[in-house]
């Protein structure tokens, strides 16, 4: 994790800079006025990773300056949730005098939630044995007795020890409704919980008058699929990463949503299947008949690289397109294609990553008349 200067006095200034930059970037597309969704000014980040430095009897978190590569001590991290900040000193204090817990520990990863759960992964340059398990269980109990709802994982080369479970349960509020999400260690989750809620509300608002079904590519753990299901008859969603697909299935069941179907496929393979160029056994096994779906709307949330040309062409076949982007540069490249057939009717900036140059954008497109 890189150095990050969190300065609440500068928050509005940096947000105004992003607003201006994003508006300027997309001015050629005749976009509507930008809708801007703010982040909390501090304690907004639900996860954080720190290296661990050992100095005599002392042990503390460090980060590295991106430019000079020099390490610096981190006792508190204002970007991270209050839960992470509360736990940071208690965790090192509890491990400092225990040889099996601190020996060759080199990194600590935190995954926290708005719901109050937190998961800690301890990474070691050695194999972990029975003594570590006993001491880690005692550590977990000690911290839970102090009021945390915590789970612990030990990791080493080709080794992962889960004391209880390797995930947290997050609860996000969307227009007064609470959605349950399983978030698994080391899999993608939205880092800024409060902004994630605003993104879901925006997506629900954009699609509230929808007819027919929704197709979603790159659905992750079902983050958007579940909230959007209320606006569609059915939702068909694709995701390639196996842990994310498993989480999505868990989340569908936990939220008692019955009109969402997840398939484990890449967007590229799904494009081939939709065009009827090839049959896929996994679609047959899941008893999914693509022809039975009436998808007028497509939702895409691609990786930083954006969508390839073939996927863009396939996406153009839908009346309405919702595109969430973590990289405005590749969004712009994709819009060069999509804007040939569609107009942008909603345009949003979500400040997922305050005090950095990163911008999360949302566009809603409708087929030209």
Curated annotation (Swiss-Prot):
Catalytic residues (positions): 326 (nucleophile), 360 (proton acceptor)
EC number: 2.1.1.-, 2.1.1.35
GO molecular function: rRNA binding; tRNA (uracil(54)-C5)-methyltransferase activity, S-adenosyl methionine-dependent; tRNA binding
PROSITE patterns: SAM_MT_RNA_M5U (PS51687), TRMA_1 (PS01230), TRMA_2 (PS01231)
Listed InterPro entries: MeTrfase_TrmA_AS, MeTrfase_TrmA_CS, SAM-dependent_MTases_sf, TrmA_MeTrfase, U5_MeTrfase_fam
Gene Ontology BP terms: tRNA methylation
SUPFAM superfamilies given in the database record: S-adenosyl-L-methionine-dependent methyltransferases
PANTHER family: TRNA/TMRNA (URACIL-C(5))-METHYLTRANSFERASE, TRNA_TMRNA (URACIL-C(5))-METHYLTRANSFERASE
UniProt protein name: tRNA/tmRNA (uracil-C(5))-methyltransferase
Organism the protein comes from: Vibrio atlanticus (strain LGP32)
Taxon lineage: Bacteria, Pseudomonadati, Pseudomonadota, Gammaproteobacteria, Vibrionales
Gene this protein is translated from: trmA
């Amino acid at each position: 994790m890189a150095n990050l200067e969190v300065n609440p006095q500068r928050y509005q200034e940096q947000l105004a800079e992003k607003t201006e930059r994003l508006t300027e970037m997309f001015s050629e597309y005749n976009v509507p006025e930008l809708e801007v969704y703010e982040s909390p000014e501090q304690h907004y980040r639900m996860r954080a990773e720190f290296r661990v430095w050992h100095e005599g009897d002392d042990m503390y978190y460090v980060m590295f300056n991106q430019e000079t590569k020099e390490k610096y001590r981190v006792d508190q991290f204002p970007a991270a949730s209050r839960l992470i900040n509360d736990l940071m000193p208690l965790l090192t204090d509890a491990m400092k005098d225990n040889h099996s817990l601190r020996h060759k520990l080199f990194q600590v990863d935190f995954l926290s939630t708005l719901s109050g759960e937190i998961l800690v992964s301890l990474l070691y340059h050695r194999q972990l044995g029975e003594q570590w398990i006993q001491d880690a269980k005692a550590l977990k109990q000690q911290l839970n007795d102090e009021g945390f709802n915590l789970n612990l994982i030990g990791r080493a080369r080709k080794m992962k020890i889960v004391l209880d479970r390797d995930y947290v349960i997050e609860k996000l509020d969307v227009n007064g409704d609470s959605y349950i999400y399983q978030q698994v260690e080391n899999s993608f989750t939205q880092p800024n919980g409060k902004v994630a809620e605003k993104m879901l509300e925006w997506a629900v608002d954009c699609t509230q008058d929808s007819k027919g079904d929704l197709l979603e590519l790159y659905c992750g753990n079902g983050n958007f699929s579940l909230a959007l299901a209320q606006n569609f008859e059915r939702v068909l969603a694709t995701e390639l990463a196996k842990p994310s697909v498993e989480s999505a299935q868990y989340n569908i069941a936990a939220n008692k949503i019955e009109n969402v179907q997840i398939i484990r496929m890449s967007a590229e393979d799904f494009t081939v299947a939709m065009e009827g160029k090839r049959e896929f056994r996994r679609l047959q096994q899941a008893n999914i008949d693509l022809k039975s779906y009436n998808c007028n709307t497509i939702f895409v949330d691609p990786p930083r690289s954006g969508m390839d040309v073939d996927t863009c062409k396939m996406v153009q076949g839908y009346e309405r397109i919702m595109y969430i982007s973590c990289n405005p540069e590749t969004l712009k490249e994709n819009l060069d294609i999509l804007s040939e057939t569609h107009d942008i009717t909603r345009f949003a900036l979500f400040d997922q990553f305050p005090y950095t140059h990163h911008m999360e954008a949302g566009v809603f497109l409708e087929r030209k008349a």
